[in-house]
A protein has these predicted regions:
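A short, surface-exposed alpha-helical micro-motif characterized by mixed small hydrophobic
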Residues: 219-221, 484-486
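Conserved ABC transporter NBD signature motif
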Residues: 66-77, 337-345
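A short, proline-enriched helix->beta-strand linker immediately N-terminal to the Walker B motif
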Residues: 171-175, 436-440
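Conserved ABC ATPase signature
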Residues: 151-156, 160, 417-421, 425
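Conserved ABC ATPase "signature" region
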Residues: 128-147, 394-412
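ABC ATPase NBD coupling module
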Residues: 78-95, 121, 242-247, 288-293, ...
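ABC ATPase "signature
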Residues: 234-238, 246, 499-503
Length: 531
């Protein structure tokens, strides 16, 4: 809570309204006050107006959107400032952690420049800026800060990129930090570490925070006030106890419902996929001639088997090798060992031999905005794979509309581009693109990470239904053990590139064999203590 001496709001939002060029209201009559050291959480379903509200505060909305109302930062109306005036405030007084770091971080710059650029502009020498960057990277949980310093964004894991984003936002010590899904790609233990850090910095700097999150477990533990948005309107707002203990609307009650149901009970079936001693390693290059000096092992000696119609959950901390293993299974990166899919060793096939099998295994990536072509409409994105088949345009259109309905997107969304969709909607487009090819195996890398609880529940129900109807198998990579528990029959726990536990879901939750697994389970439980 804000202290009594801070009786004046740092930020005051009055009657904020946002509409698009056709006059459609995207945000209607938003009002709130934010005090120093206070955390205000914005929650709501995907597309409810959370992110556009935050972008409006920073003057980052497209010019095609009209904005009305008042946004006062200590009597300065931000909506009346020019772009040069706003640029003077961004980073120094108000900073933002964006939802999708892969698209927010400059791909041409190394981490050292990405985080340190603003520090150099403030007058620090390059050496001083480098030391500050290393300190910031350590603060947000990067033990190997010196190595990360020299990496480009694409060389980092999703969680590492998100931590770089947080370090960049904290560099100039802003008075207000807007955190749009700041821990989406992080494992549950690191989520707690990052938000504990942000809470500590709040107290030290008297920093206010707007926390945009679909994770109500984190909201309950770290926020002071909650604002619930529904289709651009405020459904209700109040203290943590008011919203969580006495919700006034059915919409809020549905958001708070964290029961995803149970995974299907399966009959024995044929083995679809088998991994034997699979290892993934990346070359580390140094020197004038960029020679390979050594290798970083991302996944070591992995064995697993997956039946037709079965779902395997893979969990572990950020950088543990989960995504690298997924890319290796899909033959998108090289690996050693045997990957046997439908009787074929994928590692022994060349690209021509592999092509006929590609539609049978699909992958849904962690960061949908960077995996969807920005120049293509949703219809073109989903239909791209179908065009390689000898089927009519009419049938392609029918299949696209069917799969949009399956993932609960409107038929009209097929005319939109990725940037016009919310994070959750983009994730459903990515799933639709995979489903339309009717694969036997779908590898899902954090597919529900950007979704609110009610949309997560709908997605899990959809995946279960497809699993039952079409005998689709899943490899489901996630840091959210509650989601994995609701879908997967088996769970593999990875830690520092190795498998530390691999067993049936019920057995793993009831009798975890390692302390690391127990820590993951404890941290994922709804309402768990943050200590």
């Amino acid at each position: 809570m804000h202290s009594t001496q801070d009786d004046k709001p740092l930020l005051k939002v009055q009657q904020l309204c946002i509409a698009n060029e056709t006059g459609q209201t995207l945000l209607d009559d938003l009002n709130f006050e934010l005090y120093p050291a206070q955390t205000l959480a914005m929650v709501g379903e995907s597309g409810s107006g959370k992110s556009i509200s935050a972008l409006a505060l920073l003057g980052l909305l497209p010019e095609t959107l009209s904005v009305n109302g008042k946004v006062e930062l200590e009597n300065i109306d931000l909506l009346k400032l020019s772009q040069p005036q706003l640029q003077q405030l961004r980073g120094k007084r108000i900073a933002m952690i964006f939802q999708e770091p892969m698209t927010a971080l400059n791909p041409l710059h190394k981490v050292e420049k990405i985080v340190g650029e603003s520090l150099v502009l403030q007058g620090l020498s390059e050496a001083e800026a480098q030391q500050k960057v290393i300190s910031l990277l350590h603060d947000v949980g990067n033990e190997d800060a010196q190595q990360i310093l020299k990496c480009y964004p694409h060389q980092l894991s999703g969680g590492q990129r998100q931590r770089v984003m947080i370090a960049m936002a904290l560099a100039l010590e802003p008075e207000i930090l807007i955190a749009d899904e700041p821990t989406t790609a992080l494992d549950v233990m690191l989520q707690t570490q990052i938000l504990d850090l942000l809470k500590k910095l709040q107290q030290q700097r008297n920093m206010a925070m707007i926390l945009i999150s679909h994770d109500l477990n984190l909201v309950k533990r770290y926020a002071d006030q909650v604002l619930v948005l529904n289709q651009g309107k405020v459904e209700e707002q109040g203290t943590i106890s008011e919203i969580f203990d006495q919700p006034k609307t059915e919409y809020t009650e549905n958001l708070l419902n964290h029961n995803f149901g149970q995974a299907l009970v399966l009959e024995p079936a044929e083995t679809l996929l088998r991994l034997e001693n699979v290892t993934v390693k990346y070359p580390i290059k140094h020197g004038l001639f960029n020679q390979v000096k050594h290798y970083k092992v991302a996944a070591e000696a992995i064995d697993l088997s997956l039946m037709q119609g079965e779902a395997l959950g893979i969990v572990g901390e950020s950088g543990s090798g989960k995504s690298s293993l997924a890319l290796a299974i899909a033959r998108l990166i090289a690996s050693e060992g045997d990957i046997i899919f439908q009787g074929n060793d994928l590692n022994q096939l060349n690209q021509k031999q592999l092509r006929p099998l590609r539609s049978d295994f699909q992958i849904v990536f962690q960061d949908p905005l960077s995996s969807l072509n920005p120049r293509m409409t949703v219809e073109q994105i989903i239909g791209e794979g179908l065009k390689l088949r000898s089927i009519s345009k009419a049938l392609i259109t029918t299949k696209i509309e069917e799969v949009l309905s399956k993932v609960e997107l409107s038929i009209d969304s097929k005319y939109q581009y990725p940037h016009q969709l919310s994070g959750g909607q983009r994730q459903r487009v990515a799933l639709a693109r995979a489903l339309v090819l009717q694969p036997k195996l779908i590898i899902l890398d954090e597919p529900t990470s950007a979704l609110d609880r009610s949309t997560q529940r709908a997605m899990i129900q959809l995946l279960r239904r497809l699993q039952q109807q079409d005998q689709i198998s899943y490899i489901f990579i996630s840091h959210d053990l509650q989601v994995i528990k609701a879908l997967c029959q088996k769970i593999m726990v990875m830690h520092q590139a190795k498998v530390v536990e691999y067993q049936a879901t019920a057995l793993l939750f009831n009798q975890p064999q390692t302390e690391y697994t127990q820590q993951l389970i404890t941290a994922s439980q709804y309402g768990a203590s943050c200590n």
